[in-house]
């Protein structure tokens, strides 16, 4: 889809699953150290009911999924940030619940802002992302 065809309010959805193998690959690549991942018996004592996925792993997978959607296949994408930029209405990244390896997730990408560049054939899209676990319909 070309930049000019995107409209504020458009919504695109996809489903993803991050399994235990994906989790191990992420931990190996990111070199993430977290006692809840390294000591499952301690995690279980703390009420963790499985392989808890790191938030950054979820963000990476959700961003990667967006690049594979046909709608964005002709786009150059950059992650500008998730830090409450006042130009983007101070949006932040926050998780509302836990995600475990094997959870099936629905990811909703919505175009929340569009700023045209000089030629009108390119510009910046702001994409809001919401994640929902399919099994219990919980927003994450």
Q: Across the structure, where does each feature detected by a protein language model lie?
A:
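A beta-strand/beta-hairpin structural motif
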Residues: 88-94
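Hot-dog-fold acyl-thioester-processing enzymes
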Residues: 1-88
């Amino acid at each position: 889809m070309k930049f000019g065809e995107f409209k504020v309010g458009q919504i695109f959805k996809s489903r993803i699953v991050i399994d235990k193998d994906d989790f191990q690959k992420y931990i190996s690549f990111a070199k993430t150290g977290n006692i809840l991942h390294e000591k499952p018996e301690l995690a279980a004592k703390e009420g963790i009911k499985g392989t808890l996925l790191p938030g950054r792993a979820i963000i990476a997978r959700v961003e990667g999924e967006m690049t594979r959607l046909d709608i964005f296949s002709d786009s150059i994408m950059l992650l500008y940030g998730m830090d409450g930029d006042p130009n983007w209405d101070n949006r932040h990244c926050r998780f509302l619940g836990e995600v475990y390896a094997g959870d099936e997730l629905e990811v909703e990408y919505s175009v929340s802002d569009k700023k045209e560049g000089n030629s009108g054939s390119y510009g910046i899209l702001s994409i809001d992302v919401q994640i929902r676990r399919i099994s219990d319909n919980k927003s994450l």
